[in-house]
Structure formats: C-alpha cells, structure tokens
C-alpha cells in the first residue's frame, strides 16, 4: 500500500525541488533573511536546520557533506566562519518564520524566513527634511527642500 511521504512537493519534479531548496538555503545563509512563500519557507527551514547542526561539528567531513547540497564555496565558508560562531551553543531553532500578507498577484501565502541571531529590528526612522518633497503652490511639480532653509 502506498504511503504518503511527509514532505511538500512544491509543484516540482524531484530534481527541481532539490535545486530550489538548495538555492533558497544558499540565499538564506548569504543574506540571513529572505522572503518567499510559506510552503517553501517551511521546507527550507528543515534543510537549513540540518545543515547548521552539521556545521557546528566543524570537521572537514561535515564541510564536505554540506558542500554536496549547497555547492557554493562562499556560502559554505560564511557558514563555518560567521554563522556557526555567532549561533554558538544554541541547540536547534536556528531559523524563524514570520508570516506576511498574501502576495498581490496570486494571493499566495508569503513568509519571511531568517536566521534567529541575525534578526535586525526594522528601523522606524522617518526621512529627514532634505529627503521630503514639498509641493509648490500653484503647480503640480515637486521640489526637494534643501537642508539649509536659506536656499
């Protein structure tokens, strides 16, 4: 009797799915935070958690095993030098998935997946006066207000 495997197919062939997850994993390791669909984020989390756990061993064998799935020297180097040293003694749970609003075009469920210790608080800085545009009375054109008021 056929049994259902506990993995999402993501509407792709096995090779395409493997390549997609490898690319998402590489991008997550390089940029520390990526926006994708919720299903892809959940599948990427499984791969990334296993890779980081292997990388914590720090052996050459672990590095070769990880390189089999990632295939990007810079990402593997960054993983072993930067990410593993920053994650330190954390026992799993290296990633976080934050759900977003549905995508406009097709209403797909979207999410942000990020490495936990690299999460940056979003800046709530308002643009300065020199960045704001001011509408000129009587015309539809805008002028950028200079930093000095005397100009």
Curated annotation (Swiss-Prot):
Single GO molecular function: structural constituent of ribosome
Family per record: Belongs to the bacterial ribosomal protein bL17 family.
TM helices/strands, residue ranges: none
One GO BP: translation
GO cellular component: a single term: cytosolic large ribosomal subunit
Assembly and binders: Part of the 50S ribosomal subunit. Contacts protein L32.
Keyword Ribonucleoprotein: yes
Keyword terms: Ribonucleoprotein, Ribosomal protein
InterPro entries (alphabetical): Ribosomal_bL17 (IPR000456), Ribosomal_bL17_CS (IPR047859), Ribosomal_bL17_sf (IPR036373)
UniProt name for this protein: Large ribosomal subunit protein bL17
Any one Pfam family match given in the protein's UniProt record, by short name: Ribosomal_L17
């Amino acid at each position: 009797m056929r049994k259902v495997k506990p993995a999402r197919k993501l509407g792709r062939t096995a090779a395409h799915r493997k390549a997609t997850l490898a690319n998402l994993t590489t991008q997550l390791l390089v940029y520390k935070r990526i926006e994708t669909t919720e299903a892809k984020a959940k599948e990427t989390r499984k791969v990334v958690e296993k890779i980081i756990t292997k990388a914590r061993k720090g052996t050459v064998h672990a590095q070769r095993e990880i390189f089999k799935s990632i295939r990007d020297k810079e990402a593997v180097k960054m993983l072993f030098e930067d990410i593993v040293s920053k994650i330190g003694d954390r026992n799993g749970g290296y990633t976080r998935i934050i759900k977003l609003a549905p995508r406009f075009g097709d209403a797909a469920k979207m999410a942000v997946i990020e490495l936990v210790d690299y999460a940056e608080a979003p800046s709530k800085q308002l643009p300065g006066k020199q960045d704001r545009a001011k509408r000129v009375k009587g015309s539809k054109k805008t002028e950028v207000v200079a930093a000095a008021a005397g100009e």
